[in-house]
Amino acid sequence: MSVISMKQLLEAGVHFGHQTRRWNPKMKKYIFTERNGIYIIDLQKTVKKVEEAYNFVKELAADGGKILFVGTKKQAQDSVKEEAERSGMFYVNQRWLGGTLTNFATIQKRIKRLKEIERMAEDGTFDVLPKKEVVKLKKELERLEKFLGGIKEMKELPDALFVIDPRKERIAVAEARKLNIPIIGIVDTNCDPDEIDYVIPANDDAIRAVKLLTSKIADAILEAKQGEEAVVTAE
């Protein structure tokens, strides 16, 4: 049985690509036809590609690998956070901070600062500090949490990236490529598939499409984790 059905993909509008004037010719092999100035993605290929990505993610997670979900466009923010949290992985759903991967040590310092302020809020330090100082710290905490909250437990570089719209997330993609970190991506008709190791040709602008595909990646991780639990129980 396939990981995802044609019916699910159709209902979520995964087949709608971008307007024909906004396309990347490298995506030609994933395009089925053109309708009313819009490219229609070949869903048979999407089914196959979801399967490949699913198996890769499942194997990686079974080996204890960590995946970083990246999606900062409005249509992706909620799904990225929800599905990464559901599968116990990391995420970036606000602005990608340049150097998140290539300058990881600096990012770790910011995370350390975030945890430091969190501790101050919890241990009563805020109660004894001047009000002005507390307001300032709370603002700093809010900002750090917004940008780094999804990676604050990420102690080392991830083993793979799952990216929604590699064109929008080109800095994240470039950093991962520089470090040879494999990339799984939801790639629309206006993107360059050559930069992505596991291409999922799909509509990256519809909330339902993004949610469906992101949830499949999370399912693969959870299936791997359940497999581990089953092995432990059997032992």
Curated annotation (Swiss-Prot):
| Entry keyword set | Ribonucleoprotein, Ribosomal protein
Pfam families in the cross-refs = Ribosomal_S2
The keyword Magnesium is assigned to this record: no
Extract one GO molecular function annotation from the record.
structural constituent of ribosome
Report any one BP term from Gene Ontology.
translation
**Signal peptide extent:** none
Its Gene Ontology cellular component terms are: cytosolic small ribosomal subunit
Name of protein: Small ribosomal subunit protein uS2
| Species this chain originates from | Anoxybacillus flavithermus (strain DSM 21510 / WK1)
Q: Top-down, what is the taxonomic lineage of the species of origin? A: Bacteria, Bacillati, Bacillota, Bacilli, Bacillales
